Swiss-Prot record:
<comment type="similarity">
    <text>Belongs to the P-Pant transferase superfamily. AcpS family.</text>
</comment>
<protein>
    <recommendedName>
        <fullName>Putative holo-[acyl-carrier-protein] synthase</fullName>
        <ecNumber>2.7.8.7</ecNumber>
    </recommendedName>
</protein>
<dbReference type="InterPro" id="IPR004568">
    <property type="entry name" value="Ppantetheine-prot_Trfase_dom"/>
</dbReference>
<dbReference type="GO" id="GO:0005759">
    <property type="term" value="C:mitochondrial matrix"/>
</dbReference>
<dbReference type="GO" id="GO:0006633">
    <property type="term" value="P:fatty acid biosynthetic process"/>
</dbReference>
<feature type="binding site">
    <location>
        <position position="6"/>
    </location>
    <ligand>
        <name>Mg(2+)</name>
    </ligand>
</feature>
<keyword id="KW-0479">Metal-binding</keyword>
<keyword id="KW-0443">Lipid metabolism</keyword>
<dbReference type="GO" id="GO:0008897">
    <property type="term" value="F:holo-[acyl-carrier-protein] synthase activity"/>
</dbReference>
<dbReference type="InterPro" id="IPR002582">
    <property type="entry name" value="ACPS"/>
</dbReference>
<dbReference type="InterPro" id="IPR008278">
    <property type="entry name" value="4-PPantetheinyl_Trfase_dom"/>
</dbReference>
<keyword id="KW-0276">Fatty acid metabolism</keyword>
<dbReference type="Pfam" id="PF01648">
    <property type="entry name" value="ACPS"/>
</dbReference>
<feature type="binding site">
    <location>
        <position position="67"/>
    </location>
    <ligand>
        <name>Mg(2+)</name>
    </ligand>
</feature>
<keyword id="KW-0275">Fatty acid biosynthesis</keyword>
<comment type="function">
    <text>Transfers the 4'-phosphopantetheine moiety from coenzyme A to a Ser of acyl-carrier-protein.</text>
</comment>
<keyword id="KW-0460">Magnesium</keyword>
Length: 132
């Protein structure tokens, strides 16, 4: 079993992605999987959500959740943010899946909350019990 928590200021992510297109691109590669990069680019190009604050919040949630998951999986599993995907279960609960065949892990349960400039996330990893 593993438990992780992280807290992050959304403004920190906002400043980072405003530095330059190259900084933003490198940040996306570091913290998002391919599916999430596609979703982010759709959000960014969507005229109904052009605000930088919404983009930064979307990214901050993923960074914070993945950092909490990273902590929950330590020291047994060395996974990177780009291997993780923040998803919703069929019942609507937030979760993280690991996209790497070397890590046949159960999905990690997460909880995330944001208020004003802060995002907080916690993660709980419960290894699957062997079938008897």
């Amino acid at each position: 079993m593993g438990l992780g928590i992280d807290i992050l200021k959304i403004s920190r992510i906002s400043r980072l992605i405003q530095r330059s297109p190259e900084w933003e691109k490198n940040f996306l590669k570091k913290c998002l999987c391919e599916n999430e990069i596609k979703k982010y680019n759709l959000i960014k190009s969507n005229s109904s959500l052009p605000r930088l604050s919404e983009q930064a919040k979307w990214l901050a949630v993923r960074w914070c959740v993945k950092e909490a998951v990273f902590k929950a999986l330590q020291p047994n599993f060395r996974v990177y943010m780009s291997m993780m995907e923040y998803v919703r279960t069929p019942t609507g609960y937030p979760s993280v899946v690991i996209h790497d065949p070397r890590f046949p892990l159960s999905p990690v349960m997460v909880s995330v909350s944001h208020e004003e400039d802060l995002v907080v996330a916690n993660a709980l990893y419960l290894p699957s019990m062997p079938k008897t």
